[in-house]
A protein has these predicted regions:
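Short active-site loop/helix that positions an aromatic residue
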Residues: 54, 88-96
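Acidic, Mg2+-coordinating catalytic module of metal-dependent nucleases/exonucleases
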Residues: 128-201
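Short His-Asn-centered micro-motif
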Residues: 46-48, 66, 81-85
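A short alpha->loop->secondary-structure connector
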Residues: 95-104
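Short alpha-helix plus adjacent loop in nuclease-associated cores
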Residues: 107-128
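Short acidic, Gly/Ser-rich segments with clustered Asp/Glu that frequently serve as metal-coordination loops
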Residues: 43-44, 48-57
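Short active-site oxyanion
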Residues: 75-80
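N-terminal accessory regions of nucleic-acid-interacting proteins
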Residues: 1-44, 107, 173-176, 183-202
Length: 202
């Protein structure tokens, strides 16, 4: 399934590919690997949807292409960013998959939305704060109870594919922006500390 021009914030659009073909999934993973093996830190958004809770054993509703296991365990070129991902990690583990424990970031633990005093900020809160207000309503596009029963079926309805794509993009883009701001602040602090050093930077 190829969904072109899925609307996100402003005039931005996503080009989304959803497949149940293992060979196509492996090609996509290979393409990602080629793109991320560069000089700069690379982040990959991760989110896991589950099969129906009322039809045990519940497991990750994911395909297991041959490249997925080493992709999740890779430790040099990229870091996975997710949101409240302890449940996702456990569900992946029960399906025989595991993310490298040294290469993932739980955004919910690393970032707080300023001036919003609640215990746990949602992805919608964070993405709405750092990307665009559009994302504040992203979770309202599906029925959190009934639609979550559909993740284990094939083919998935288009609106759930769109939802999953927006969710993954919001996770990735949120952390990329947060990390970019953090790096900029650290660089500015370092320059300020060495402002009077004529040899700094050489």
């Amino acid at each position: 399934m190829h969904l072109k021009e899925v609307d996100i914030h402003g005039k931005e659009k996503l080009d989304v590919v959803c497949t149940s073909n293992p060979e196509e999934a492996d090609k996509m993973i290979s393409r990602i690997l080629k793109r991320v093996c560069g000089l700069y830190p690379q982040y990959i958004g991760v989110d896991v949807e589950y099969t129906r809770e009322d039809q045990p054993p519940q497991r990750a509703a994911v395909l297991q292409p041959k490249s997925l296991r080493p992709f999740l365990k890779e430790d040099r070129f990229y870091t996975f960013a997710g949101f409240s991902i302890e449940g996702d990690k456990e569900m992946l583990r029960s399906s025989g998959l595991e993310i490298n424990p040294d290469k993932y970031i739980d955004i919910q633990r690393k970032w707080r939305v300023p001036f919003k005093y609640i215990d746990n900020h949602s992805l919608a809160d964070v993405a709405g704060s750092v990307i665009h207000p559009f994302y504040k309503q992203m979770k309202n596009k599906i029925d959190r109870v009934e639609d979550h029963k559909l993740w284990g079926i094939s083919p998935l309805p288009n609106y759930l594919i769109e939802y999953a794509a927006i969710d993954a993009y919001a996770t990735y883009e949120s952390w990329k922006r947060i990390e970019n701001i953090r790096e900029g602040l650290e660089s500015a602090k370092e320059e300020e500390k060495n402002y009077d050093d004529p040899y700094y930077g050489y």
